[in-house]
From Swiss-Prot:
UniProt keyword annotation of Protease present: yes
Superkingdom, taxonomy of origin: Bacteria
Cofactor note: Binds 2 manganese ions per subunit.
Binding-site positions, Mn(2+) 2: 196, 201, 219, 280
The protein's role, per its UniProt record: Probably plays an important role in intracellular peptide degradation.
Residues involved in Mn(2+) 1 binding: 201, 278, 280
Protein name stated in the entry: Peptidase B
PROSITE patterns reported for this sequence: CYTOSOL_AP (PS00631)
Protein EC: 3.4.11.23
Name of one Pfam family that matches: Peptidase_M17
An MF annotation (GO) of this entry: metalloaminopeptidase activity
Amino acid sequence: MSTQMSVFLSQDSAAPHWGEKALLSFSETGATIHLGEGHDLGAIQRAARQLDGQGIHSVLLSGEHWDLESIWAFHQGYRNPKKHGLLEWTALSEEDQTELQARIKATDFTRDIINKTAEEVAPRQLATMAAEFIKSVAPEGTVTARIVKDKDLLAEGWEGIYAVGRGSDRTSAMLQLDYNPTGDENAPVFACLVGKGITFDSGGYSLKPSNFMSAMKADMGGSGTITGGLGLAILRGLNKRVKLILCCAENMVSGRALKLGDIITYKNGKTVEIMNTDAEGRLVLADGLIYASEHNPELIIDCATLTGAAKNALGNDYHALMSFDDELSHQALTAANKEKEGLWPLPLADFHRGMLPSNFADLSNISSGDYSPGASTAAAFLSYFVEDYKKGWLHFDCAGTYRKSASDKWAAGATGMGVRTLARLLNEQAEK
């Protein structure tokens, strides 16, 4: 039978026998997290990981020092996809309790769907699960959703999604979700959110080695993150019309699969030569960005686990941000800072758009030359599919979406990082 442990916060140091600068101590009343001076949320998250690692399956956050942010930090560290520990806390104000429950609902959706196996989350299932989640958090009657799949993708001109997914036995899909709280079917679309939804990425014929393929069930992390962000924005009161567009496919090897040298002709007329089938995320996102541009929104945001280059630059602790719109980038970075999430700008300039030459098409899907800035040229590729790419477009390369192994703050698996930033950014832009 499991016994609940009370956990307290203290600014006092632990007794010497617990070790120098000990973070945790224990007594008959429970465990105490020793923060020292200040209110270090990172220390709280690390303590939660330690308690989970010690097999503490039920926790009550007790005492007077627990507030919204400290409870949230503990939840982030304590959550474990294998153990599902029980976490309870003392009463918060109604406003803080509502916010905490909204964060948990949105980020738990994101973490759970990214952690699921590729067998559980095929492209059509990803689109369906995302639509069901948004419907569950939105006011009744404000959400409509359409899933375009298989040969219908070709009929409607979504060549990139179809081409990437044609090597799989699992049907590719594009989710076209409309959140419209205005009650006016002719209301302008304020924002379009585009997510990369590669539910498993083998690399295709540019095959990944096993150690790089082992986490590729999480290559739909951009879709999971941006769906969670929209969900949290809705729970926080988003009052403008938003389209959610998820570009879902499985990148596999077969006799039907995309081959090097193939050329894709996109709906906007751009032709792309395939020089690496493992640079597939940008190929599906291109369709989503074209569809987004057709609605003339004020804001286009795409999220994708797009490049290893971003992860090499930033590790797991930051997402990368790229944009030609400096003012909007600053607002996104400010939103991340307010939400205490890691977001870091990487360069994106006009000359990056010239680093994708092809002898047979308008563009290659990879850059040429030695020491190519892979994250920047991937974003530059996407810019060819955003009608007004200089203004109102943000690209998130989600380096911090998933951890292959546990750290001192996180269990292995999805983090949910970026959900709060996206929600705040959407709501702040909508209120202007």
